[in-house]
Amino acid sequence: MGSEVWVGTWRPHRPRGPIAALYRGPGPKYKLPTNTGYKLHDPSRPRAPAFSFGSRPPLRHATCGPGPSYLVPARMTVRGTVGSPAFSIYGRLSHTAPVLTPGPGRYYPERARNVTYPSAPRHTIAPRNWGILAKQETPGPGSYTVPSLLGSRVISKVSAPTYSIYSRSPVGSCFEDLSKTPGPCAYHVVNPMIYKTRAPQFTMLGRTLPPRENTKKPGPASYSVDKVVWSRGSRGRG
């Protein structure tokens, strides 16, 4: 007892870290899986025998021939068809247009000239193809507009700040119409005959013509008395 160092009376103090003995856990209820034995099996329990059913392996066919689903003709054998020879009669072919082959009179051997005899090489200079150049719609020098050197439109030039002066806005000013009502000129003058005593009104018709017949009748000049050759006399009285 004399060799031990006296540290004083023990007093309760706060531990520096958590002590596992002070907490209650699940205990040995859970076990870690073992590294030996069967997979997904508790080693503390007996294990019954287990069997696995494998899949059926595919059948290997020695020959790939047609099965009963194909209908083989009855006269077909290994050496060919058994039976009498058979022939097919086709229809008459349609008449095709005759080939228009040029005759001897269509050829002009006298125009061959140097083609049939050895001659020096000859070259042909083709004219300038204006058709292709005409289709190229390329803008000319006058189609390009050179940017102005004034203002802020030149990218490579330093310009002073520019300001725009806008017109006076009616919003918030004394000219703003907050009521949105029409003025005196928006109303039309009402006819006083509507709300006052209406005076008598008369209508004047046009001049009326007496009724007359509009048929065209012959006048005195339409009759030729001198051309009458026979006239019926008066009827006698009985």
Swiss-Prot record:
- Keyword set for this entry? Cell projection, Cilium, Flagellum
Subcellular location per the Swiss-Prot or TrEMBL entry: Cell projection, Cilium, Flagellum
- The STPGR repeats are at 182-207
**Major localization listed first in the record, in broad terms:** other
Classify the source by domain of life.
Eukaryota
**Gene Ontology terms: cellular component:** motile cilium
Read off the InterPro entries from this record.
CIMAP, SHIPPO-rpt
Chain segments carrying region Disordered:
206-238
Any matching Pfam family: SHIPPO-rpt
Disulfide linkage: none
Q: Signal peptide: which range, if any?
A: none
Q: Which PANTHER family match?
A: OUTER DENSE FIBER PROTEIN 3B, SHIPPO-1-RELATED
The family assignment reads:
Belongs to the CIMAP family.
Specify the protein name. Answer: Ciliary microtubule associated protein 1B
Q: Which organism is it from?
A: Mus musculus (Mouse)
Tell me the lineage of the source organism.
Eukaryota, Metazoa, Chordata, Craniata, Vertebrata
